[in-house]
């Protein structure tokens, strides 16, 4: 994969930038004008410390210990102790792509110049990112206020040569990983440990990763919905633009246009335009634009919130270098991320729910008109029977996972931090839902293409035919029972890679999250 260069202008990251970074291979360079501003901010912190006034997290303890004054000669120890004590996460390491996003977002937030850190701090974060030093960040342990303390402490531990990091496939001690990459750890100055730990970058990175994966998944679900509609010999009449314009919901209008484009020129559709005794299709076919459009609108709302948060200063206290002020606030509270993640969880779960119903229709011979469970010699062969059960199990699991996390606060830090967002779990579980729905869509993909094969020599539309042919390159027709999981994994891989969206061509305008 070719590595490209991305110049980071603090506070100016777009969704397109995040998409390119997440799915591509990019080295990040800091805009040249940023270094001087960061140096001025660090000098301002020195002046504030020199005045001797108590400033939270600079010369005081943290959380409930904020009233404890720290002597000037112990300020570096204070920052180091903060990092070490707060590195209390647990669980499996976060995925590398998520950790890379965390490094990018933390560098972006600090580089805006309102956290009082030296330019060397931001540069080391970017050097770690570019050299492939990936901190080991346990997935559990943050409540999303005061920021993502435990995850970011594990990231920051590597900055000071502690903790662990992956480097070139090996899990090493933090100092060893830095040394192997030709980097050196830093000694943190006043405010710098707190600036590294405070912030919403872990929950935001998890949410953005889930969002970008969900975008590809959403496109795949639109396409498999079209495949199923044609395999079940459904009608495209409910996609008439006049219906959707009258309702006025933007996502619904766009999704209806996608279905019209997907069905254009289908010989299967043409074969039952007349003398079809069915008056209306079931909701899972007929109401696809309404359901998918609502999901699209909410994914877009989440995207707007998350791009803002990706560029946010979510530190505390926030430093205003022009006036040498430190103002304590609550920008670390990740409620916007938590609610955005909850919206995503509901939307993606619904994408899977309606897809599972389409799949159930396909395997039901009375509903679809296709062979029972989409296999010849049914009875001797069980065909897609249990694959549909797997999809149903995952759709049901998603109903529990989609329960809002943001409404489930618990007080922490001796009731000083008495309302928290649960944003990190909120975002992390969206990734679980996305993965479940990938499998549901994968089984629908397999089933719909199997159904189309039974309708030969009639062919579906040109774009849908390309999607079917892509599957058949790796998964043959299901002529008799065989191990099913390998077929599911092959279909999942195509969905993860975005292959379905690439197949349909420019004639089908798949909706982007920027809409």
Swiss-Prot record:
One of its GO terms (biological process) is L-histidine catabolic process to glutamate and formate. Pfam families: Lyase_aromatic (PF00221). It comes from the Bacteria. Belongs to the PAL/histidase family. GO terms for cellular component: cytoplasm. This is Histidine ammonia-lyase. The lineage of its organism: Bacteria, Pseudomonadati, Pseudomonadota, Alphaproteobacteria, Acetobacterales. It is found in: Cytoplasm. One of its GO terms (molecular function) is histidine ammonia-lyase activity. CDD domains: PAL-HAL. Contains an active site 4-methylidene-imidazol-5-one (MIO), which is formed autocatalytically by cyclization and dehydration of residues Ala-Ser-Gly. Pathway: Amino-acid degradation; L-histidine degradation into L-glutamate; N-formimidoyl-L-glutamate from L-histidine: step 1/3. The modification 2,3-didehydroalanine (Ser) is found at residue 146.
């Amino acid at each position: 994969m070719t590595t490209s260069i991305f110049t980071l202008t603090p506070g100016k990251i777009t969704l397109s930038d995040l998409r390119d970074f997440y799915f591509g291979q990019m080295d990040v360079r800091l805009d040249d004008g940023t270094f001087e501003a960061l140096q001025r901010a660090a000098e301002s912190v020195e002046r504030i410390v020199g005045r001797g006034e108590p400033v939270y997290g600079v010369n005081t303890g943290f959380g409930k210990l904020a009233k404890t004054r720290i002597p000037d000669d112990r300020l570096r120890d204070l920052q180091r102790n903060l990092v070490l004590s707060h590195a209390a996460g647990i669980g499996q390491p976060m995925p590398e792509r998520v950790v890379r996003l965390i490094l990018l977002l933390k560098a972006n937030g600090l580089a805006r110049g309102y956290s009082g850190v030296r330019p060397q701090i931001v540069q080391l974060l970017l050097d770690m990112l570019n050299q492939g030093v990936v901190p080991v960040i346990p997935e559990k342990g943050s409540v999303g206020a005061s920021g993502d303390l435990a995850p970011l402490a594990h990231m920051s531990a590597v900055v000071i040569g502690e903790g662990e990091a992956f480097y070139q496939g090996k899990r090493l001690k933090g100092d060893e990983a830095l040394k192997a990459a030709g980097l050196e750890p830093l000694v943190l100055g006043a405010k710098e440990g707190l600036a590294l730990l405070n912030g919403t970058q872990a929950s935001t990175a998890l949410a953005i990763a889930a969002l970008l994966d969900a975008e590809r998944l959403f496109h795949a679900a639109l396409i498999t919905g079209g495949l199923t509609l044609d395999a079940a010999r459904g009608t495209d009449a409910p996609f008439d633009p006049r219906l959707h314009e009258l309702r006025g919901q933007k996502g619904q209008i766009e999704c209806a246009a996608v279905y019209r484009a997907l069905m254009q020129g289908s010989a299967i559709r043409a074969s039952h335009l007349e003398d079809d005794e069915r008056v209306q299709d079931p909701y899972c076919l007929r109401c696809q634009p309404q359901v998918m459009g609502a999901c699209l609108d909410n994914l877009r709302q989440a995207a707007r919130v998350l791009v803002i948060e990706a560029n946010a200063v979510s530190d505390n206290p926030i430093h205003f270098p022009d006036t040498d002020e430190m103002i304590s606030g609550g920008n670390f509270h990740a409620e916007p991320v938590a609610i955005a993640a909850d919206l995503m969880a509901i939307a993606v779960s619904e994408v899977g729910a309606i897809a599972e119903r389409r799949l159930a229709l396909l395997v039901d011979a009375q509903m679809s008109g296709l062979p029972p469970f989409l296999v010849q010699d049914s009875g001797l062969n069980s065909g897609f029977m249990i694959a549909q059960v797997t999809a149903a199990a995952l759709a049901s699991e998603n109903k529990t996972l989609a329960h809002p996390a943001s409404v489930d606060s618990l007080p922490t830090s001796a009731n000083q931090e008495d309302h928290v967002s649960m944003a990190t779990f909120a975002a992390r579980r969206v990734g679980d839902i996305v993965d479940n729905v990938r499998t549901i869509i994968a089984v629908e993909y397999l089933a719909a293409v199997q159904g189309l094969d039974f309708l030969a020599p009639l062919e579906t539309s040109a774009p849908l035919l390309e999607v079917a042919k892509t599957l058949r390159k790796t998964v043959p027709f299901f002529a008799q029972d065989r191990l099913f999981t390998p077929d599911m994994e092959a279909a999942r891989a195509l969905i993860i890679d975005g292959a379905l969206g690439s197949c349909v061509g420019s004639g089908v305008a798949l909706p982007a999250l920027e809409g």
